[in-house]
A protein has these predicted regions:
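Catalytic core of membrane glycerolipid acyltransferases/transacylases, capturing the structured
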Residues: 96, 123-183, 209-212, 216
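Active-site metal-coordination segments of metallo-dependent hydrolases
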Residues: 46-51, 157-161, 220-224
Length: 312
């Protein structure tokens, strides 16, 4: 039965992606958005909708006057919008491997930070890019490859293995070099930096469970320390980057100034300091477009407590 479910999962993903790539873009966005919104139909503790609402409550509460809570109706509305945006993300990812260079360039605009890219390149080495789960970062990665900044990016392993292999092939077609998340991922990233390439890490979720404690949207949690560790060990600049989806089916990228990665103490202390600085930049990025934050898993200790209570 497990093999049948795995096969069905593989066929569902691959056939849907093939369909998205062969229909008009507007149709693909509508279909994918509709399918994704079905995820929001289930409510209650521990569901994707509930997790999105918890994350957005923190995001909006961080902008409120102390003691004032965000409007629950507003939180629900924004949370449901994330599913539509998530569908658009999947539709874009399905057609991106088949896009021409002209198509990729025409639908991407680097709104801010080209000077940071050029300054990092002038140093004669690669650099580290840290991103949140916002918008369509793969589109930015494909554009970077065309601009001469090829990216080696960490990718969470998926099950079944043939589905993971399919996703790897898709990202290679985008100009990205995927590396499975795990103990062996640092080697390829370091080699990419030494080859004057980009090491990309999506860093707003501690998927392994061995992250660095930070305050993120006013609450203690852990975030991955990999980006900070790589920058400290290689001397590469650490650039926070975000790619938003914009009206008219195009994408808007921003490269922020490099974080201060000066060695000031022990490696552990410096990684903690830099990761906290990165968390503050991510807060700013996410606040600008909270509806594009695709995070439906527990990300704070209190989220795990709620999920555990729901299962009980």
């Amino acid at each position: 039965m497990g093999d049948l479910r795995d096969r069905a999962k593989y066929l569902t993903y691959t056939k849907l992606a093939a369909g998205m790539a062969n229909i008009p873009e507007a149709w693909a966005h509508w279909i994918a958005g509709t399918v994704a919104r079905t995820m929001s139909m289930r409510s209650g503790p521990g569901t994707p909708l509930a997790m999105s609402q918890r994350h957005l409550h923190r995001t909006l509460a961080s902008e409120c006057v102390e003691g004032v809570e965000p409007d629950p109706a507003l939180v629900r509305r924004w949370a449901r919008r994330t599913f539509r945006e998530y569908g658009h993300y999947w539709a874009d990812g399905a057609r991106l491997p088949f896009e021409s260079e002209a198509g990729i360039r025409s639908e991407f605009q680097l709104e801010r930070g080209r000077d940071h890219l050029e300054a990092a390149r002038a140093l004669g080495r690669g650099y580290v890019m840290a991103l949140p789960h916002v918008g369509s970062w793969e589109w930015g990665g494909a554009w970077l490859a065309l601009e001469g900044y090829p990216m080696t990016a960490v990718m969470e392993e998926l099950h079944p293995p043939e589905l993971f292999e399919w996703f790897v092939a898709q990202r290679k077609a985008m100009g990205l070099t995927p590396v499975p998340l795990g103990e062996g991922s640092s080697g390829p990233l370091i080699r990419a930096i030494k080859a004057h390439k980009v090491a990309g890490l999506v860093s707003d979720r501690d998927m392994v469970g061995n992250g660095v404690e930070v305050t993120f949207f006013g609450e203690k949690t852990t975030l991955p320390g990999g980006a900070a560790t790589l920058a400290l060990r290689t001397g590469a600049p650490l650039l926070p980057v975000v790619v938003y989806s914009a009206p008219g089916n195009w994408h808007s990228g921003e490269v922020h100034a490099p974080l201060d990665t000066t060695r000031t103490g022990s490696l552990r202390d410096d990684v903690a300091r830099i990761t906290q600085d990165l968390a503050h930049v991510f807060e700013m990025m996410i606040r600008r477009h909270p509806e594009q934050w695709h995070l439906y898993q527990p990300n704070w200790p209190s989220d795990h407590e709620e999920e555990g209570g729901a299962k009980a």
